[in-house]
């Protein structure tokens, strides 16, 4: 598994993942900001390159996997087809830091508070260290789904960067979410 470490703070409802990649920092950065490259491990769509800009991601998790994958669990059925996610860029400092709000409500969608995602890249010898923090999650259940999701997406990123087969997103997500559920206190 490419994740070096994963930590959660249930009181703050936040997650932090650390991964390392044998790739130039500029190449890892491109996989964060280029819609075509990002669509291969997370979601297509646009992320404006400046603070205050729009994030308009288009998830299509069914297209991330090879033929070995299976349908998502029933509670995630709506997430298998095209699914938009909107946010605002909080910081864009190429090639080191990208931060944005996650799941901002559209007009008329109520007043839920968005969560925040921060991705930081740094050189560590001949490797790149990626630290992803997702903060201000709404609940433990939400944290479990996000933990399984980010862990699986980061595994896909590592496979893309290293030229390995991507593997089954939903199979991995389902296994990881169950593992986080066992490990995180209730």
Feature annotation, model-predicted:
Residues 1-51:
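Hydrophobic ligand-binding cavity/cleft-lining segments
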Residues 79-86, 114:
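Short coil-to-beta-strand transition motifs
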Residues 12-18, 54, 84, 97, ...:
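Intrinsic-disorder/low-complexity, polar/charged segments enriched in Ser/Thr/Lys/Arg/Asp/Glu/Gln
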Residues 37-38, 60-65, 91-98, 106:
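Short, charged/polar surface micro-motifs in flexible loops or helix N-caps
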Residues 25-26, 48-51, 90-96, 120-129:
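A short, structured loop/turn motif at beta-sheet edges
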Residues 135-186:
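A conserved amphipathic terminal alpha-helix motif
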Residues 91, 101-157:
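Beta-strand/loop substructures that line and gate deep hydrophobic ligand-binding cavities in soluble
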Residues 35-82, 169-175:
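Short beta-edge strand/loop motif at the mouth of beta-sheet-based domains
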